[in-house]
């Protein structure tokens, strides 16, 4: 409840779990072998789906427009040119969708009524619809060919991070600027909270920034 003290609970599965979100009064987590589990309280979990054997679901995001859905983007653990994308209204019943370049996506977020996806070779795509109309995804010019692993939004600014210390910022998703991260380590995740961006990566890298443009290593205790 405070983020400091944690209690182990049984998840109802033995598969590795990769991502979790909370919406519509429930937690939904996804992981290896297409596993989807749900919980209303975080203590008691139920396996609701096995979307595709041998497939790892690495990301899940919730967004709302005309219709609200959970969306989880699947990534094959083996080398493949194809990726599977699923949508769900309730987190229990899932429908497979066709999404071009899905296998190249690393992360998806929902911000400002847009689904925003980042992936290999600097790919950034946005969609104002997201569900049922996958051809509406628009490629954005990102200024880099480095693989992108994560994106976040806060304080009126988008921040995307990736391989070799790549950090890019944008206020409108159309014009991106590469900024100096001060590291060459791969950066795997970005988040925003309490007026600050936080980025983490390999070799124990933790960076913080108040504006997304100037970054400093976090103090180690």
Model segments located where?
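Residue-level hotspots at or immediately adjacent to binding/recognition sites across diverse folds
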Residues: 1-221
């Amino acid at each position: 409840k405070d983020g400091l003290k944690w209690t182990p609970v049984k998840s109802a599965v033995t598969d590795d779990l990769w991502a979790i979100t909370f919406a519509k009064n429930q937690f939904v987590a996804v992981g290896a072998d297409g596993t989807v589990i749900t919980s209303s309280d975080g203590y008691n979990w139920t396996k609701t789906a096995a979307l595709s054997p041998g497939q790892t679901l690495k990301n899940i995001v919730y967004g709302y427009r005309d219709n609200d859905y959970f969306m989880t983007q699947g990534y094959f653990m083996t080398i493949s040119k194809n990726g599977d994308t699923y949508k769900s209204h309730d987190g229990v019943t899932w429908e497979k969708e066709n999404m071009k370049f899905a296998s190249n996506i690393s992360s998806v977020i929902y911000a400002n009524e847009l689904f925003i996806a980042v992936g290999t070779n600097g790919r950034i795509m946005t969609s104002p619809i997201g569900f049922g109309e996958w051809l509406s995804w628009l490629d954005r010019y990102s200024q880099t060919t480095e693989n992108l692993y994560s994106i976040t939004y806060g304080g009126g600014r988008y921040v995307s991070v990736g391989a070799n210390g790549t950090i890019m910022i944008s206020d409108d998703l159309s014009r991106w600027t590469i900024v100096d991260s001060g590291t060459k380590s791969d950066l795997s995740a970005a988040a925003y909270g309490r007026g600050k961006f936080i980025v983490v990566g390999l070799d124990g890298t933790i960076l913080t920034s108040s504006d997304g443009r100037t970054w400093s290593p976090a103090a180690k205790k």
